[in-house]
């Protein structure tokens, strides 16, 4: 089904396709022009990495809701974030742009300048009822960027309140302030479609120690990632991570039940994904797959054939243009993301679009745990066969200065690796996660899927490395990345708002 056939089948006319953020009065009231448009339920976990879902093959974690969405929709095996860090990753999702284009928004604990258009605002102008609960864009502050609410829209207490057609008494107006924490009393206009962001705080640390084991998980069943040492302490930590993944999955299941009760389940495009990889050494805040590859499943039975597994590369920055196109709007000209509506509606599995053969990722400042508050800038290109990483400041410590290695979240696994760093089974893994790195890294995924053996200096890979480096720099220059234009130090000069920030905006 091509785009024209799709919109004709779904009753979205040509006039709707021409919308660029403007809506008629009838649309704002939820008039006839909106009746054919789907709802959008976007569910994002905090630090959920591929392949930690039962449908992806994990033998311990149980994710029946994600499995259902994937079985009844499309499971994407190669979905990647723009950055393996909360704030820039979520900014890229909302704007449909690479995070390096977002100025301050390219860093953790920052602000997202108001000049960057976000898809919820466009949908709201087109008549959609929008909002979020819990963690949306962030952590960071709205006001320094010129915003009066979170970029994801007004905050609601929960999904039930959001769906109500009348205002809720005794609630705070708007979502303004640091992190947009005020509770909205905005009522859903009758007949209006909605776009809702459910942002769980799971499975972000801290965890309750042994919560996974106490729930019945067995540490001997855990498949320990090759980048981590195999110990009971690490295995127990992973089980605790699994327990929070399961809690996220359960809560999304409750949202689906609510939609079914209201008769809106099958006219809602449902997305389940994560904002970056798991919070363990050499995972989150790194450009290896455990930091950037996230689960992604999309269900929309009205238009998307289910039971499919797609191998195409998808960037989560592709979501914004996809949402806009699904709703009959054109993506804005500054979006670098590319709609994958054609992949969703193709009915195909495997490799669908030959052009989706690679993805780009990057990283700027995560924590401020280096002298001078600087980051560890990286960019990468990931193809089916290779991962190439360019480290722009190899003299810096990628995990943060050794006083605390602050770019790695505190955890029992981190503690174990630091305390046992000189032992034979830990020493090399510690150096890979905590030590300095060369300017270039290259991993042959056909031989090294765990990305532990850097072959960048081997002569037999010289041509492949040169080709990948050229493709990476071409994309960075085409999208005006300051790092590729000799202006990358600007990221280290932007304010860091993490120190003393309120806990509820994390």
Where are these regions (language model features)?
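Formylglycine-dependent sulfatase
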Residues: 2-441, 449-470, 474-477, 481-484, ...
């Amino acid at each position: 089904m091509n785009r024209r056939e799709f919109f004709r089948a779904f009753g979205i006319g040509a006039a709707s396709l021409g919308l660029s953020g403007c809506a008629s009065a009838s649309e704002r009231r939820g008039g006839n022009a909106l009746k054919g448009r789907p709802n959008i339920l976007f569910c994002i976990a905090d630090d959920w990495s591929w392949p930690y879902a039962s449908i992806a093959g994990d033998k311990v974690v149980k994710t029946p809701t994600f499995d259902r969405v994937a079985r009844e929709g499309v499971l994407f095996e190669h979905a990647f974030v723009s950055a393996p860090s909360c704030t820039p990753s979520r900014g890229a999702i909302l704007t449909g742009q690479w995070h390096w284009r977002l100025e301050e928004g390219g860093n953790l604990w920052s602000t997202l300048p108001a000049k960057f258009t976000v898809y919820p605002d466009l949908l709201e102008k087109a008549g959609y009822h929008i909002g979020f609960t819990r963690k949306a864009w962030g952590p960071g502050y709205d006001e320094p960027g010129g915003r009066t609410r979170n970029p994801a829209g007004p905050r609601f207490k929960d999904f039930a309140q959001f769906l109500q057609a009348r205002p809720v008494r005794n609630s705070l107006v708007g979502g303004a302030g640091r992190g947009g924490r005020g509770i909205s009393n905005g009522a859903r206009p009758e007949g209006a479609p909605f776009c809702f962001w459910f942002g769980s705080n799971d499975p972000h640390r801290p965890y309750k120690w042994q919560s996974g084991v106490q729930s019945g998980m067995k540490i001997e069943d855990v498949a320990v990632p090759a980048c981590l040492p195999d110990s009971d302490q690490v295995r127990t930590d992973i089980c605790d991570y699994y327990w929070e993944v399961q809690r996220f999955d359960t809560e999304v299941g409750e949202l689906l039940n609510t939609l079914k009760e209201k008769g809106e389940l099958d006219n809602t495009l449902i997305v389940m994904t994560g904002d970056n990889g798991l919070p363990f050494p050499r995972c989150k805040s790194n450009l290896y797959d455990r930091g950037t590859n996230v689960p992604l499943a999309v269900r929309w039975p009205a238009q998307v054939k289910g039971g499919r597994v797609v191998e195409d590369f998808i960037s989560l920055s592709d979501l914004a243009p996809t949402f806009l196109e699904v709703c009959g709007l054109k993506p804005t000209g500054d979006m670098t993301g590319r709609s994958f509506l054609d992949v969703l509606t193709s009915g195909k599995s495997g490799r669908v679009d030959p052009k989706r053969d690679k993805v780009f990722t990057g990283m700027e400042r995560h924590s401020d745990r280096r002298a001078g508050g600087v980051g560890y800038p990286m960019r990468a290109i990931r193809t089916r066969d290779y991962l190439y990483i360019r480290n722009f400041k190899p003299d810096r410590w990628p995990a943060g200065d050794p006083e605390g290695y602050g770019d790695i979240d505190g955890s029992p696994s981190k503690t174990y690796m630091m305390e046992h760093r000189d032992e034979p089974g830990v020493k090399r893994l510690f150096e890979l996660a905590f030590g300095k790195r060369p300017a270039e890294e290259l991993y042959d995924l056909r031989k090294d899927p765990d990305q532990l053996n850097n072959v960048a200096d081997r002569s037999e890979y010289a041509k492949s490395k040169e080709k990948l480096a050229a493709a990476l720099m071409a994309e960075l220059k085409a999208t005006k990345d300051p790092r590729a234009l000799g202006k990358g130090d600007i990221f280290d000069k932007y304010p860091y708002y993490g120190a003393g920030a309120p806990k509820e905006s994390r």
